[in-house]
Amino acid sequence: MKSPRQFELLINVGAAIAGIGVIGYIAYAALHKDVDQPCSTRYPAATRFSLHNSEGKPLSAIALQARAGLRDLGVIDNASVVRSAGGPAEDVLEVKLRQLPAGADQDAAAHNGIEFRWSPPGMKPATAACLSYSVLLPDKFAFGSGGFLPGVFGGTAGLSRDSAAGLSVSPEWERDGRPLIASTSAGRIGRISGNKSAWPTGRWVRIEQEVVLNEPGKEYGQTSLWVDGVLTLDSRSVLLRKDAGETLSGVLVAAGYHGTPPEASSLRISPFEISWR
């Protein structure tokens, strides 16, 4: 038979173990609370890429190309601003996923869809950014050999998203439609996957992507992807830069297939928004 002192000791030990468990849970929740929430809830007010001119009318292809800056691929041929009944915005960007015509660009044979860069005033230098937009992949969308969606860029911008001189982090889809995050930095290419579900098709899907640059010499850069508010992919050990002078500059507006498109198709993207710090 245990003495009262032994019972008291057992109770105290049990209480201590329970207390440690509670403290551990609180610490875990505190560490994971931020990353579980979409990044738009934790960043300053976002800057939007407008699809309208000064008169409030949808941009023409020529005006869109002018807003795209000095370098673009496929904007005139494959991009247009269209009305979207029931979508997340009144007007959205429609991208035809077709090969660029011969002569459209010296790299036309290797590209489809569109690509350009947008740098909001005041963004550079930034070491963290949150990009958000919605995308509509048609019902029975052919994922082909994989493809890519708009992401974040920085560093020294090259002429294409595959440039060895640049830094980019973008959502992509695999052959089977599963999402992944692809990063390119100084010629290094990394991919983060693991989600078992394919990108939803036939409806609008909300995307939020967070990129946090690592301190030079340390591999703890962060890339996270939320799909319809659910954290889908997350990594906190990504080497995104080696030089403190490499910072985030804006949105890499790129959408298309890797390789030749499997069939004539298109997708739609709502006006994208980015915030930074």
Model-identified regions with their sequence ranges:
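Low-complexity, Ser/Thr/Pro/Gly-rich disordered linker/stalk regions
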Residues: 8-277
